[in-house]
Amino acid sequence: MHWIKCLLTAFICFTVIVQVHSSGSFELRLKYFSNDHGRDNEGRCCSGESDGATGKCLGSCKTRFRVCLKHYQATIDTTSQCTYGDVITPILGENSVNLTDAQRFQNKGFTNPIQFPFSFSWPGTFSLIVEAWHDTNNSGNARTNKLLIQRLLVQQVLEVSSEWKTNKSESQYTSLEYDFRVTCDLNYYGSGCAKFCRPRDDSFGHSTCSETGEIICLTGWQGDYCHIPKCAKGCEHGHCDKPNQCVCQLGWKGALCNECVLEPNCIHGTCNKPWTCICNEGWGGLYCNQDLNYCTNHRPCKNGGTCFNTGEGLYTCKCAPGYSGDDCENEIYSCDADVNPCQNGGTCIDEPHTKTGYKCHCANGWSGKMCEEKVLTCSDKPCHQGICRNVRPGLGSKGQGYQCECPIGYSGPNCDLQLDNCSPNPCINGGSCQPSGKCICPAGFSGTRCETNIDDCLGHQCENGGTCIDMVNQYRCQCVPGFHGTHCSSKVDLCLIRPCANGGTCLNLNNDYQCTCRAGFTGKDCSVDIDECSSGPCHNGGTCMNRVNSFECVCANGFRGKQCDEESYDSVTFDAHQYGATTQARADGLTNAQVVLIAVFSVAMPLVAVIAACVVFCMKRKRKRAQEKDDAEARKQNEQNAVATMHHNGSGVGVALASASLGGKTGSNSGLTFDGGNPNIIKNTWDKSVNNICASAAAAAAAAAAADECLMYGGYVASVADNNNANSDFCVAPLQRAKSQKQLNTDPTLMHRGSPAGSSAKGASGGGPGAAEGKRISVLGEGSYCSQRWPSLAAAGVAGACSSQLMAAASVAGSGAGTAQQQRSVVCGTPHM
């Protein structure tokens, strides 16, 4: 049996392996191809000829298709191998082709849809190339000397399904409609067509297949391959070759093979397993053929005789009175001396005229037809519960010599039967039955059987029209509406449930209540809001908003007032905005105070933000201006220090440097460009004009006349001759205190007043020792210094000379030539010869 199963399994596996050769196919169904202009993918005419005037192609295309199916590619390579296959069709038409008529193209060897069978598990993705070519010589190669009309590239995820997926591709000149799908071959199932299942009903299996390819056994078959039949239900010791069959194993029998076969020759026995013999009661022996209880099995004694087993299948019978024989089969009809029918010393008397032919006179204490019954007397105490009385035999109960008087609850000849006076129970309504049959009634009932319900309403009166209802050992008052309590003495207060809504006041009435409503509400329970808008109080197109005990009018543009009966003097825009916001807020259920608060905040918050922005802007601007002012003052202070340095040096070189720095606007815009080796000069990179050193008092008047021609703020540079005079009005303009945080040039050597020795030409050119002997002037000196020292210059209001004249003055001073008048002329720009 085992080798048959192995052979069956091997055959099935071999069949499955051999038949897995193709699992499904990809199908492409071409439907419509349109190329109305007869052009290729580059816009050229397929025929190569066109109308010169209209540009219309004169000829038509001869269209064939090439289809290539391959594995999924993120970027489709049109030149690589078609891994799933490719198909080249014959010429199917000209410019436009209707491919839905499959019968039309069968003669050309073209089958639509185009199928690409595969013998692997479908991966779920694909790449498809569909090309339309123009063929001029109807060759088999679609790409040789042909023109490409259209190329379609498709890459998609596609599941196995019998439904077609419709697509359409359009280009500048062409369009193509097509369908595609993937289906499994017959007997292949699953998402990849990889599960094989073939229906069969033969010796190798009996099954069908589900939609997913699972094996489903036919009725009556089971097993992995549905090759095992299901035997009849209850078949215990059997097998089957067909469904619902039960072929018994050796030693079993019956429809369900549940009966064992007895040992051969077993007569009076059973079995619980094959080939056994279990003897029935009264039988023994190897085959259960020996009778061990003849009396029980055969009952040989008749006429009431008693049988006794004597062993080995033998027995004896004890006959009842009046009978005789081995089996007590003979009835006695006379007083035979050998067989006396009367027992217990009874005397037999022949009476031929009777049926039995004799009669027995029993001895004292016995009775019965054959004197077989003992006569009892009171001495035997036969009465169990009663009183015993001796009587003559035959007069008592059943011929006995006594008679019993039974007490209540007992009966029977011997008072041994207890009477059940409570069965069935005579007491009703829950009464308790006593052994004597008397009923003890529960409270509320009376009578022999507790059948009477005591009227508990007697002596109890219900008030206010209530009705008394009698109950078991109690009563209940059914009150009329409006009253309650045990005797209906209390009035129902319907106001306890607070039926009045919206603050209404409740007044209790008889079985009713009355609500006194607040202003603005009405109804039985004050739940109805009175619509104050029902009368149309709003005029001039105003919208009425119902309120509690009031109304509110949302006025149209141009009107105001409680009822919109006044013309509005506010702007239309403001009214519309205000009332629109108010309407929306009130529609949202806000109170007037909330609406006002929201309106104030909606206006105030943007205003506060604008004010804060303005304050920040002004503070920044103020800081910027203060910074610029401090920077300007610092620059001015540094420039004055620079001029003072030139005066201190007293040389033509220093003046020339000052002229170059102060008058160099035609050069670079770098401002002051003193020698970087001079530590006493701070360079000015802003190229601003500075206040120069004052000239002599005599030059002040001439400077005032030439002030208009100066480009700077008007000032003079002293000549070398003036420098030689110790009492000259020449001085350095006083320096002002700088308010700027920037560092100033406070070198103490800058502000020494020139002495006669230090102001000589030698000192100017060589820087003699007199330069260090003059009085030191503090950088932070008083502002009145120059005005006290040179009152004439202060009166003229001259601060300095322009940079261009300063250069000329420096030249004259450096050479030592020219008079003071010439020097002044050069400085102020007035030519004097």
UniProtKB/Swiss-Prot annotation:
PTM summary: Ubiquitinated by Mib, leading to its endocytosis and subsequent degradation.
Pfam families, alphabetized: DSL (PF01414), EGF (PF00008), EGF_DL_JAG (PF21700), hEGF (PF12661), MNNL (PF07657)
Ranges annotated as spanning the membrane: 595-617
Consequence when changing residue 787 to G: In strain: nps_6, nps_18, nps_34, sonoma_048 and sonoma_050
Residue ranges annotated for the DSL domain, each copy included: 182-226
Keyword Transcription: no
Membrane topology: Single-pass type I membrane protein
GO MF annotation terms: calcium ion binding; glycosphingolipid binding; Notch binding; receptor ligand activity
A GO BP annotation: follicle cell of egg chamber stalk formation
PROSITE patterns referenced in this protein's UniProt entry, alphabetically: ASX_HYDROXYL, DSL, EGF_1, EGF_2, EGF_3, EGF_CA
Compartment(s) where it occurs, according to its Swiss-Prot or TrEMBL record: Membrane
Chief place where the protein resides: membrane
Entry-listed glycosylation sites: 98, 137, 167
EGF-like domain mapped to chain residues: 227-258, 256-289, 291-329, 331-372, 374-416, 418-451, 453-489, 491-527, 529-565
PANTHER family: CRUMBS FAMILY MEMBER (PTHR24049), DROSOPHILA CRUMBS HOMOLOG (PTHR24049:SF22)
Remaining remarks: Separation of neuroblasts from the ectoderm into the inner part of embryo is one of the first steps of CNS development in insects, this process is under control of the neurogenic genes. Notch and Serrate may interact at the protein level, it is conceivable that the Serrate and Delta proteins may compete for binding with the Notch protein.
Function: Acts as a ligand for Notch (N) receptor. Essential for proper differentiation of ectoderm. Delta is required for the correct separation of neural and epidermal cell lineages. Fringe (fng) acts in the Golgi to determine the type of O-linked fucose on the EGF modules in N, altering the ability of N to bind with Delta. O-fut1 also has a role in modulating the interaction.
Name the record gives this protein: Neurogenic locus protein delta
Species the sequence originates in: Drosophila melanogaster
